């Protein structure tokens, strides 16, 4: 018979390494942070709970959010690359190819000299 004071939750660590899943049993009043600590996954990879984003079924949650039975707690690591810098690199790469696709970002700039009628 199941203990009504304990619930089963799944904790998933999603970083650059392959994801790791651990099933833990926590108290019925446990928070997201309690489940993460009980899983021991952060100690394995050397991360702190403050450096990670936490969520339940893909929705971001605060560490003090309460859990329900059979929830899946997700731990995502910090971003490796700055999204703005990555986008700038992609745009620069497309512009360098000289294709029409690369020109759509240049609307407010003068057209290239070879396109000017003369």
UniProtKB/Swiss-Prot annotation:
Which Pfam families does the record cross-reference, listed alphabetically?
Ub-RnfH
Name the domain of life.
Answer: Bacteria
**InterPro entries referenced in this protein's UniProt entry, alphabetically:** Mopterin_synth/thiamin_S_b (IPR016155), RnfH (IPR005346), RnfH_sf (IPR037021)
Q: Which HAMAP family match?
A: UPF0125_RnfH (MF_00460)
* Annotated family: Belongs to the UPF0125 (RnfH) family.
**Name of this protein:** UPF0125 protein RSc1426
Question: What is the phylogenetic placement of the source species in the record?
Answer: Bacteria, Pseudomonadati, Pseudomonadota, Betaproteobacteria, Burkholderiales
